[in-house]
Curated annotation (Swiss-Prot):
Record function comment: Removes the formyl group from the N-terminal Met of newly synthesized proteins. Requires at least a dipeptide for an efficient rate of reaction. N-terminal L-methionine is a prerequisite for activity but the enzyme has broad specificity at other positions.
Active site: E137
Positions annotated to bind Fe cation: C94, H136, H140
Recorded GO MF terms: metal ion binding; peptide deformylase activity
InterPro entries linked to this entry: Peptide_deformylase (IPR023635), Peptide_deformylase_sf (IPR036821)
Principal EC category: hydrolase
Enzyme Commission number(s) of this protein: 3.5.1.88
GO biological process, any: co-translational protein modification
UniProt entry tagged with the keyword Cytoplasm: no
Protein name per its UniProtKB record: Peptide deformylase
Family: Belongs to the polypeptide deformylase family.
Source organism: Chlorobaculum tepidum (strain ATCC 49652 / DSM 12025 / NBRC 103806 / TLS)
Catalytic activity of the protein: N-terminal N-formyl-L-methionyl-[peptide] + H2O = N-terminal L-methionyl-[peptide] + formate
């Protein structure tokens, strides 16, 4: 099932998500739906708060990027960044902020402690694009969007577009929670 995506200014995106205590059939179903939703949008990462679940759960698949064609889809539960290295500036976008992109400075490499879809613990190093995608998605779990990390001057330049999203005046090629909720209210 394709889940509607919550957009900029939705309260769930500003909350610190709750850790998972384990993986049961409901979480397995949510993981599958998150992958379906991410692929349909299309995106390369999706955090549970983006689909209305305040849980520390992320799915990532960067194999659509040529240099990462061999990458295997990844489920990240209860992630915690334990070390950072380097620094890089790159343009980011987000399914929760449709139609907007902006430059964000982030560490270029991270060491991450997390659990997988079987709730097994891992500690691994990630660099380059994967480090960036993981940090972007982990930000969602902490109530932060990439626009919150943009330079203040750049952020001011996109404020009208952000206001339009907050007011529901935005279209996307994937279902938005605000549109779904509006249709349900009218029914």
């Amino acid at each position: 099932m394709i889940l509607p995506i919550n957009t900029y200014s939705d309260p769930v995106l500003a909350m610190k998500a709750k850790p998972l205590k384990g993986v049961d059939s409901a979480i397995e179903e949510l993981i599958a739906e998150m992958f379906d939703t991410m692929y349909k949008a299309p995106g390369i990462g999706l955090a549970a708060p983006q689909v209305g679940h305040s849980l520390r759960l992320v799915v990532v698949d960067i194999s659509t990027i040529k240099e990462y064609a061999d990458f295997k889809p990844m489920v990240v539960i209860n992630p915690r960044i334990v070390a950072v290295r380097g620094r890089s500036l790159m343009e980011e976008g987000c399914l929760s902020v449709p139609g907007i992109a902006g430059n964000v400075v982030r560490p270029s490499a991270i060491t991450l402690h997390y659990r997988d879809e079987k709730f097994e613990e891992h500690t691994a190093d990630f660099h380059s694009m994967m480090a960036r995608v993981l940090q972007h998605e982990i930000d969602h779990l902490d109530g932060t969007l990439f626009v919150d990390r943009m330079d203040k001057r750049d952020r001011r330049k996109i404020q009208k577009e952000l206001d339009a999203i907050a007011e529901g005046r935005v279209k996307a090629d994937y279902p938005l929670a605000r549109d779904v909720n509006r249709v349900e209210a009218e029914a």
